[in-house]
């Protein structure tokens, strides 16, 4: 059995812990019953020996499978990872959603997206990445107790993402510690109004509103100061045709949205300006986690 889970970009500027979308950059997980347990990793993380000793996917899969079947079975795990680790592109959420979904499939039990997301909250308390990883598209999500409430909007082929990926990783937990505990009324209204406008812009496909609607006063500038080159990435992207340019999650990647016809030029100009960074031109994913075999 093989499943795939897309990368995600969350926050999207003002939508802190709430807004996210899925990208056509995927991790693929293959699981097969075996006499002995084994793990094989290709792609991102393949050179990290810790991922073979304490693998989060394997742990979550086995915990979920045991709850569903009350069985302890050995499996052979094969991972083909395209999502960069610790770069703000939802690699952890892909693992969580993938492991829970795979456990249900292997146990031959059906699960709704709501059920998968509810279980995922035990491992990730913020819904902005796990929701688009599960259902694809652009998502608005919130939580109450053990439930995720969300709405999803498929993204059209007329827009694309250009993602700039520095080689420097970022720790989400450390990044959160640098943020203020309180915000002024002025900044709160600034973000609330733009988060609302950004959501409406995505649902109505008013791409002309994205630049203003994606401005933020909660987290981006503070996080970007840890890696000042990101200010230049954002400036260059907006100058060269991006409709919006935002820190992806807690970073260090930067998400840029543009019209489909502008994507090759924007990607090339960003690559020329930042030759030491990876630049990927990506479609959006509207399916979320899917079974591939």
From Swiss-Prot:
EC number: 2.7.1.39
Coiled-coil region: none
Pathway: Amino-acid biosynthesis; L-threonine biosynthesis; L-threonine from L-aspartate: step 4/5
Top-level EC class: transferase
Cellular component annotations (GO), alphabetically ordered: cytoplasm
Pfam families xref list: GHMP_kinases_C, GHMP_kinases_N
Binding positions for ATP per the UniProt entry: 84-94
InterPro entries: GHMP_kinase_C_dom, GHMP_kinase_C_sf, GHMP_kinase_N_dom, GHMP_knse_ATP-bd_CS, Homoserine_kinase, Ribosomal_Su5_D2-typ_SF, Ribsml_uS5_D2-typ_fold_subgr
PROSITE patterns hit by this protein: GHMP_KINASES_ATP
Task of the protein: Catalyzes the ATP-dependent phosphorylation of L-homoserine to L-homoserine phosphate.
Protein name, UniProt field: Homoserine kinase
Species per Swiss-Prot/TrEMBL record: Wolinella succinogenes (strain ATCC 29543 / DSM 1740 / CCUG 13145 / JCM 31913 / LMG 7466 / NCTC 11488 / FDC 602W) (Vibrio succinogenes)
């Amino acid at each position: 059995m093989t499943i795939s889970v897309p990368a995600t970009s969350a926050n999207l500027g003002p939508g802190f812990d709430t807004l996210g979308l899925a990208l056509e950059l995927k991790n693929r997980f293959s699981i097969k019953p075996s006499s002995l347990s084994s793990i094989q990793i290709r792609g991102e993380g393949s050179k990290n020996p810790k991922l073979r000793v304490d693998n989060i996917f394997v742990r979550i899969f086995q915990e979920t499978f045991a709850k569903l079947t009350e069985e302890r079975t050995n499996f052979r795990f094969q991972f083909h990872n395209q999502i960069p680790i610790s770069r703000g592109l939802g690699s952890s959420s892909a693992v969580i959603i993938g492991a829970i979904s795979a456990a249900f499939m292997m146990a031959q039990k059906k699960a709704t997206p709501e059920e998968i997301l509810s279980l995922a909250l035990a491992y990730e308390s913020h819904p902005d990445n796990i929701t688009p990883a599960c259902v694809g598209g652009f998502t608005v999500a919130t939580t109450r107790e053990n439930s995720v409430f969300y709405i999803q909007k498929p993204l059209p082929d007329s827009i694309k993402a250009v993602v700039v990926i520095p080689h420097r990783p970022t720790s989400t937990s450390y990044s959160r510690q640098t943020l203020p505990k309180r915000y002024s009324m002025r900044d709160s209204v600034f973000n609330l109004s733009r988060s609302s406008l950004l959501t409406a812009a995505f649902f109505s496909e008013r791409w002309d509103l994205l630049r203003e609607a994606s401005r933020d006063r909660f987290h981006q500038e503070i996080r970007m100061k840890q890696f000042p080159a990101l200010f230049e990435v954002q400036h260059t992207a907006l100058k060269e045709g991006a409709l919006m340019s935002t820190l992806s999650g807690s970073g260090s990647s930067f998400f840029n949205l543009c019209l489909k016809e502008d994507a090759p030029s924007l990607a090339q100009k960003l690559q020329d300006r930042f030759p030491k960074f990876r630049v990927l031109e990506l479609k959006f994913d509207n399916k979320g986690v899917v079974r591939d075999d």
